[in-house]
Amino acid sequence: MGSATLLKESGPREVFCGLTSIVWLHRRMPDAFFLVVGSRTCAHLIQSAAGVMIFAEPRFGTAILGEKDLAGLADAHDELDRVVNDLLARRPEIRTLFLVGSCPSEVIKLDLARVAERLNGELQGRVRVLNYSGSGIETTFTQGEDGALKAMVPLMPNSNEAQLLLVGTMANAVEDRLIHLFERLGIPSVSSLPPRQSTDLPSVGPGTRVLLTQPYLTDTARELKDRGAEILQAPFPLGAEGSRLWMEAAAKAFGINNNHVANTLAPLIERAQKALSPYKEQLAGKRIFLMPESQLEIPLARFLHRECGMELVEVGVPYLNREMMQSELELLPQNTPVMEGQHVEKQLDRVREQRPDLVVCGMGLANPLEAEEIATKWSIELIFSPIHGIDQAADLAELFARPLHRRNLLNNQLLVSV
């Protein structure tokens, strides 16, 4: 294990809803539909987060649980069957239907797994029905994707062929560049989960080597391991250094010559470092406090310190999978406080005491901190931005330079007005 100081606290948390993952998953798989079984609040959240145009035909919706459902006065299963049948009659192009649990559906113990099993029998293969939980109870907002991908793993066909499997949603253009780069390295068979069509699932088996693109896919990784796949240990592909080490792990697993890997990646690394240079000048020496929300916090901290020169005040993470994060923890500076869990009031006290230059946090905490003249960065923005790979290192750094620049402008305006 690395030299970071691992700490733990518990208490009241500031969290965002796991249903948010539908926003990037429904864009990834256009032949899938995500049906949330929840309240009107769930419906408003998804519609607001996705920013649906008025004339668009969305690939998600909400089966709203009414007061009778919540009180147990109506058979929610019958009503859900009716909604599903109406949906499939109106949208025959749907190939995979995800039933997504929410806080309300979990409170009333609605068994969506049983509903999905029954519907699969009735639909007889015309549409595949899967289920997972997007509830915000005891989860982070990124874990919705973990639940969705875990539900897909049992449907993946068996294969003993040697292949590389990239697991986790990335921007299509970024994924295309990475796959092309792996091919240049000498790995010809590269597939991804989730696929771009929900029915075009990659195969898995003893010959499969898995690279995780996101650090919050713990359950999916466990399911793939149970299917015989090997999970490669590596830092995550954020920044030039992390992406290089990530790709080197795959090359090593496939026995590719080290010199060939170095020669292939060297020009990309040089270009990335040159593009990073102006942002490093803005970020170097600045102090950053990462509050726990997305589970990207540790890889981001490694990138911001090692490639941008930022000082790490505290690195919060909702949950710490030590095995999955071992490669990242080893790259953090000595005695970096890594806080697993959250007592939001105590963390805010530490933020106010330390007065960092930048705080990465949830939207609910950003405005109050900005009012106290502390620059903030929404953690959810990092999920929706194309930040993976060597080529995206400068774009990732810019996301952190921007709020500091904004804060400087505001401070200058205040000085002028005074």
UniProtKB/Swiss-Prot annotation:
Pathway: Porphyrin-containing compound metabolism; chlorophyll biosynthesis (light-independent). Its EC number is 1.3.7.7. It is an enzyme of class 1 (oxidoreductase). It comes from the Bacteria. Pfam families: Oxidored_nitro (PF00148). [4Fe-4S] cluster binds at C17, C42, C103. Transmembrane segments: none annotated. Its cofactor is [4Fe-4S] cluster. Belongs to the BchN/ChlN family. Component of the dark-operative protochlorophyllide reductase (DPOR) that uses Mg-ATP and reduced ferredoxin to reduce ring D of protochlorophyllide (Pchlide) to form chlorophyllide a (Chlide). This reaction is light-independent. The NB-protein (ChlN-ChlB) is the catalytic component of the complex. PANTHER family: LIGHT-INDEPENDENT PROTOCHLOROPHYLLIDE REDUCTASE SUBUNIT N. This is Light-independent protochlorophyllide reductase subunit N. It comes from Prochlorococcus marinus (strain MIT 9313). The gene is chlN.
